[in-house]
Amino acid sequence: MNTKAVNLKSENTTKLVSYLTENQLDEFIRRIRIDGALVEEVSQNAKQALDNTGLNGWINTDCDEGLLSDFISKIASARWIPLAESIRPAVTDRDKYRVSCWFYQGMNIAIYANIGGVANIIGYTEAAVATLLGAVVAVAPVVPGTPTPPKDKSSQYKEVPLAVRLSETYHEEGVRGLFDELNYSESRMISTLRRASTDGVLINSWNDGQDTILLKKYNFQDLQLTVRSRIVGNQTIIEECKITDGRKTLSDETV
């Protein structure tokens, strides 16, 4: 994947980065797919998008504390979401920091700092991830220390917030874990959820004072999906999904 890079000298950078190993970074890249196709190239609009951010003058240059603070304020305004809870400790003065901005179709996917060959993810934009996954998956922040709600073992439904969480909780509560258990591919999962949000049988609809909320049911092979979605402009955002497996009752071990 092509990258645009900014070299930063400040040790304070480490306070903003979340630690991932190179193998985890490879896994992160592997998961960003559109119907199974790996995102490999930067679109022609990427350079213009970078120019529009005002960060183009920092590409492949070292910057001081002032520029670093300005840079961080700019990316903070894009609503960056941490990808992991652990924070890498400070390193020595001689280390160089390279922060790379990834683009796809003119959108910033992620920023990471490369310290000694180890990738340290800072965050990703929810808009970018939602676009990559078909603009129907709502991305929610993962707040460190937030307790997981207890699961109701008596229910045959598994309530799964459709937040694409590229962190530890992605494995624990993500929809993909459920589909893996049921032997459905990631691309099929994405296309199924997209169809469920648009083609399902309407059960109920209402307005919450801001947007229209739809509740639909959709059958896919042995699965029944009850999908709650929100209409925002011309975009359908999936907020919640209850999944029933016709072959068995879902257990706590499913996700």
Swiss-Prot record:
Keyword Cell membrane: no
Alphabetically ordered keywords of this record: Antibiotic, Antimicrobial, Bacteriocin, Secreted
GO cellular component, one term: extracellular region
Propeptide: 1-101, 145-255
Cellular localization per UniProt: Secreted
Any one GO biological process: defense response to Gram-positive bacterium
Record flagged with keyword Secreted: yes
Chain's role: Bacteriocin with specific antibacterial activity against strains of P.freudenreichii. No antibacterial activity was detected against P.acidipropionici, P.jensenii and P.thoenii.
Protein name according to UniProt: Propionicin-F
Organism: Propionibacterium freudenreichii subsp. freudenreichii
